[in-house]
Amino acid sequence: MVIRRLYQFCASHVVRNCSSLKCAQNIHGHNYEVEVFIETNRLDNANMALDFGLMQQEMQVFIESFDHAHHFWDKESLEFQRFIENHCVRYVKCSFNLSAESYALMFLYYLTKILQKSVFSNDEGELKVSSVRVHETKNGYAESFLKDLENPHFKSLVHDHCVSFSQGIQNLWHDKDFFNKIISDEKQCFFHAKPLHQIP
């Protein structure tokens, strides 16, 4: 059984080294759509794989951290990086080139960590993020799968510190340790209470 949740954010970037010069040589933006697919082996007490409302908490906070921000590769010139840091309140510094494929791998990596560190209380089954799709436009998307995180050609692109959020983004997190919890060694960080009203 698989469920899907759609998230959206708007952001700008440059995709260096690609054939499309408009993308490689210019700051430009997209209205991104991120589809997150979660797989389970059984349903919970509400006959759900996972309540969609729970997917509007930590997962949504993480994805919305990329909204209305400029994202840049840490291989950009120092002059360019300093310009962004000095003139943008919201920016994300990334250790990977900013293709849709890289975004898909990155979101899969961090959302998997969030789900693994989440404690649910409504008799949920074994949950995993089976894939993530990232759309830059309506015409195409990149999709990453769990097995991609074991592929040496892919997994070297993503790691605990492959993104760094500006202070302006962090200031809007209700939990100032939000990102540190995601990448910490703690196995349980995000707790979700059992629904109050239950029919036996």
Swiss-Prot record:
Catalyzes the conversion of 7,8-dihydroneopterin triphosphate (H2NTP) to 6-carboxy-5,6,7,8-tetrahydropterin (CPH4) and acetaldehyde. InterPro entries: 6-PTP_synth/QueD, 6-PTP_synth/QueD_sf. This is 6-carboxy-5,6,7,8-tetrahydropterin synthase. It comes from Helicobacter pylori (strain ATCC 700392 / 26695). It comes from the Bacteria. Pfam families: PTPS. It catalyses: 7,8-dihydroneopterin 3'-triphosphate + H2O = 6-carboxy-5,6,7,8-tetrahydropterin + triphosphate + acetaldehyde + 2 H(+). Its cofactor is Zn(2+). Belongs to the PTPS family. QueD subfamily. The active site is at the interface between 2 subunits. The proton acceptor Cys is on one subunit, and the charge relay system is on the other subunit. One of its GO terms (biological process) is queuosine biosynthetic process. Keywords: Lyase, Metal-binding, Queuosine biosynthesis, Zinc. Binds 1 zinc ion per subunit. It is an enzyme of class 4 (lyase). Signal peptide: none annotated. Its EC number is 4.1.2.50. One of its GO terms (molecular function) is metal ion binding. The gene is queD. PANTHER family: 6-PYRUVOYL TETRAHYDROBIOPTERIN SYNTHASE, PYRUVOYL TETRAHYDROBIOPTERIN SYNTHASE. Pathway: Purine metabolism; 7-cyano-7-deazaguanine biosynthesis. Zn(2+) binds at residues 13, 28, 30. The active site is at residues 23, 68, 136.
